[in-house]
C-alpha cells in the first residue's frame, strides 16, 4: 500500500509523500509490491493525485470521472498504479498482476468506456508474449521448452472448469504432459526466470498455485516432517530432542495474558534460526531489549512449507492463528529475520502490523542509539568514531576482510533486506570490503532450497547451490553473507560434502553483526543421529507411520 497508514490519506501533502516513497524512492515500501497496486489510495483525494500523475495532466478531469463512478479503491487504485508505473518506468521494481475478471466487471459497472478500455489495455500489457526469455534463464523450463505463459494458460484452462472436475483434468493433463509436471515439481519458486519479464509475469505465484492443484489431484504426497501447523514437525522435534527452548522469553502465544502495553513487538526468527541457532537467537533478543523494544517471540514457522506442499488453506489458517495472537497481545510491530517470512505475512497483515526486516531495524535504531550516545558524525552522515558507533548500536561485528552478499529470492523485488545489510556493513564494518556478485539484487541466483525441491530432485538443489558458491568465489571475497537462514543451512550443508577447493566461508548476516557463529557440523550431526538414537522409534512412528 502506497499509503502505508490510513492517516496518510487525510491530506494531499501526506498522500504525495506516501506515493513518492513507494513508487519512486522505494526506500521504505512494503514487502509485496502487488499490495501497493491493490490499494494505492484509500480515499478520493489520493486517487485524484495518482490519476493525475499517471497520465501527466491535471488530476481534476480524470479524478472527477473516477470519484463519480463508485469504483472501489481496490480496482481504481490498482488500475491507476499500473498505469502510473508503466508511464514512469517503475514497473521493473514492482511486483504486479493483472486485474481479475471480477475486478474488470466492477470497473465495467462504472459505465465509463474510457476506464474499461484503460483497464483492459493494462491487462494486455501484462499478457505473455511467449518470447521464451524465461525459458532461456531457467534449466527447469529450458529442458522441456516451456515458458511461464504456457504454464499460466494451462492453469487458466483448468481453473475455468467446475471445481469438482479440476482434479481429474489435472491428472489427465499431467499424465499426457509429464514434462510439464516434472518442471512444476522442480520449480524452486525463486522468480529468477521472470525477473526481467517484459510483460511482468511472476513465475513464483503461478508455479506455486499448481502445487495446490497437484495436492487436490493426488499427484503430490506431502511429508509430515514439514507440516508445520502440526504439533510435531522436523523443527519442533529437533528442539524437543536436544532441549532447545526459550523459557526466559515470553512466547507470543502467551503474550495476551500480560497487561495491555506490555509488548509492542514480536520477534519472528523463523523456524531454522530458532531451532538451529538458539544462542544467536538469544543474542538478537538481548539487542532488542537494549534497543528499547518491548518484545516477545514466536517460535512458529511462517507456513512456507505448507504452501510448497499445496496446503494453501492450512497455511492461511496457520498465519491467521499467529495474526490473532499478535492482535490479542496488542502488538503493532513484527521483526523478521528472513525475507521469506516477511513476504508470507505481508499479504495478510501489512495493513495492520508494521513488518520490519531485522537488518533495517538494526540500521535505523542503531542510528538513534548513536545519537543518544552523542556519537559525532561526518559530513556524509557516517560516524567519525566507528568503534564508538558500534558500542552505541549494541553490535559486536565479526572481523572479516571481505564479503559478498547473496541476496534472497524473496528480496528480489523488494530489496529491503539487501539494502539494509549492505548499509549495516558500510556503517559499522567499514573495514570490510564488499565485493558484489554479477548476479545480485533483482538478478540474484537461487540456492535451490525453495519449493521442497530437494526431496523430489536433489540434483537441482545441488546444481543451484554450487552455482551460488562459484559465483561467490569469482568475486574473490573471503566470506559469503546470506539473508535467509534456509540459504545459510543449504550452503553449509553443501560445504560439508564439497571438495576443499569449492568450500567457502559462509555466514548469515546476523552471525557477522553479532559475532556469533552457527556450528553447522554439530547441527547436521544431530539431525542425522536423532533418527537412530533413543528417539528414533518415536520419530519414525510419528512421521512415517
Language-model regions, residue ranges each:
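Hydrophobic alpha-helical topogenic segments used for membrane insertion/localization
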Residues: 48-59
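Intrinsic low-complexity, disordered N-terminal segments enriched in polar/charged/small residues
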Residues: 2-4, 9-10
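Cofactor-cradling patches in redox/metallo enzymes
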Residues: 200, 272-363, 412-424, 435-545
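Repetitive helical segments and hydrophobic/amphipathic motifs
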Residues: 13-15, 19-21, 26-29, 35
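Iron-sulfur-cluster electron-transfer modules
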Residues: 72-97, 101, 108, 115-125, ...
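Catalytic cores of enzyme domains
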Residues: 358-415, 428-431, 443-449
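Membrane-penetrating hydrophobic segments
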Residues: 41-46
